[in-house]
C-alpha cells in the first residue's frame, strides 16, 4: 500500500517542481510590459528616444541650466538697438541759456549706431548673434519650445476631434456615417500647405498681434488635420462594434456614449498612440515651412523655421551658416526622432510582429 501511495504522489510532486522551476526562470508579462520589451529591443526605437530626450532637454531645460551655470541674459547679451529718451523743453523766439547768451544753431550729425549683429562665436554667444543682435543659441532653445509645443497641442486636438467624429460615424452608421465621411473626403481633397499659406496671408491682413498668431495657426492646422484620425477610428469601430462584449453592453443597457468612449475607444488606443507619434513630425515640418516662407511665427518670437527664413539671402547663408544650419539640424532630429519612435511603437503593439 505504501509503495502504491508513493507511486501516486510522485507525478504530483514532479509537477509542482516543474511549476516552481518555471516560475523561477520565466515571468508572466502583462501586455504593457510585453510592448515595452519589444519596443526597447529595436535599435531605431532607442535612437529615437535618445534623440527626443536630448531635444526636449535642450529646449525646455536648457535656459534654466544656462542660468544655473552663470549665463546671464542681460544688457550685455541682448545687444538690442539703443533708444534715446525723450526730453521736452519750452522754446521761445530767442532761446538763451542761464547766463542770457543766445544759443547758436545746433548741428546734428547723422551717424550709424552699431549693435552687436553677426557677432562671432564666443563664450557669451556660443553660436554668435543674428542681424538684430539676438543670441542664436538662446533663440534655438526658445524656438524649440514653440515648435514642439505647437506640435503637441495640434496633435492632441486633432486626436480628440478625430475620436469623436470617427466614433460617432463608425458606431451609428447610416446617414450619420455618410455625412461625416463626406466631410472627411472633402478635407482630404484640400491641399494642406496652400490653405495654410492663404490663411497666414488673411491673418496678416487682420493685423493680429504676434503673440496671438500662433493660436490661429494651431486652430487652422487642427481643422484640416483631424480627418485621417477620424477615418482610422471609424474603421476600427466598425469591426469592434460586432464583437461579443459590445453586444453584452447593449443587453445590459449601457448608454451609447459609454459604449463608444469607455469600451470601444480604449481598444484602439495603440493605433491612436502610433498615429499621434507619427503625426508630430509632419506638424513640425508644416510649421517650419510656414515660418520659412515668412507666414509662421513672426519676430520677436523664435521658431526654428523663422530662424531659417531670416537667412534666405545667399550672402548671409554663405557667410553666417550658424544662423540657419543648427535650426535645420534640430528640425531633422525632431522629425526623425518622432518617426523612429512611431515605427517602434507600431511594431511593438503589433502581435504579428516578429520583433
Model-inferred region functions:
Residues 1-159, 163, 253, 296, ...:
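Gly/Trp-centered helix-boundary motif
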Residues 129-355:
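Alpha-helical transmembrane segments of integral membrane proteins
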